Amino acid sequence: YSLEEEASPIEIINVRVQAVGETDKPVLQTDERVDADPSAAKKEERSVYIPETQEFETVPIYDGHKLSYGHRIPGPAMIEEVTTAIFVSSSFDCIVDKLGSFVLYAKGQEDLIEATLEGAA
């Protein structure tokens, strides 16, 4: 069905535009590697519910903003930041990679942890 009213002005209902362009690849800022001990970032200890045991347990709480490349947090633990909280299960460890990301690994995966710290993974 269509209708043409020659006396009426043209009205555009929808317009879609797609643009493609090239940009320079961003240079990502990396941190210097520090000792694995995260104790300077520890805020407190708090009772936290542990899903594996279905019980509350007192675990260390770390300030995620104070953690740096190379820090290693053994589970169970909590990492808190302004916008998120990360639970590290007792079956996992967490490391901070060179870009500041928190990477969780099953305990015993030392080769993967070291590969991540060296930037190979």
What are the functions of these language-model segments?
Residues 1-121:
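C-terminal, non-catalytic interaction/recognition modules in large multi-subunit enzymes and RNPs
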